[in-house]
A protein has these predicted regions:
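Terminal, non-globular segments
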Residues: 53-54, 58, 64-85, 102
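Mixed-charge, glycine-accented linear interaction segment located at domain edges/termini
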Residues: 85, 90, 96-113
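A short, sequence-level motif marking secondary-structure junctions
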Residues: 22-24, 44-47, 61-64, 80-84, ...
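Tryptophan-anchored aromatic micro-motifs
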Residues: 1-13
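Short beta-strand segments that buttress and anchor functional surface loops
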Residues: 6-9, 30-34, 48-50, 93-98
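Short, surface-exposed coil-to-beta transition loops
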Residues: 17-18, 34-36, 92, 103-107
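Short, well-structured hydrophobic secondary-structure segments
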Residues: 19-58
Length: 113
């Protein structure tokens, strides 16, 4: 099912950017793309994946995995925080990798087209 998405991305509590995009929700999997990245969110298993030309970042409840495509190299990155919430038509994902100074939070509001 196609969805209209409003996506707010925060670092700590500071809004970095806001996007209005189209996405697809099927079998509890939300997919969408912006100009540089594609995203897959498994709502049931609380998995967030972000992919671009250079890398794939996959965040699970217990760990984060970074794949460097050009080098065909996988790195497991310690995860200091992962919070995944779904309320009605809103998904909130917050994570802090050990290599980050500040946590990132992504709020996605979905509505039918």
């Amino acid at each position: 099912m196609n969805k209209e998405l409003t996506i707010n991305t925060y670092e700590e509590d500071i809004l970095l950017f806001k996007e209005n995009l189209l996405g697809t929700l099927k079998n509890n999997i939300l997919t969408y793309e912006n100009e540089t990245d594609s995203f897959i969110i498994d709502i049931h298993n609380h998995i967030f994946q972000k992919e671009n030309l250079e890398s794939i970042l996959k965040i699970r409840p217990d760990k984060a995995l970074l794949v460097l495509k050009e080098l065909d190299h996988k790195l497991e990155i310690p995860l200091n925080k992962q919070d995944f919430q779904k309320e009605n038509n809103k998904i909130i994902i917050e994570y802090l990798l050990e290599s980050q100074e500040k946590s990132l939070k992504i709020e996605i509001e979905m509505s039918d087209l």
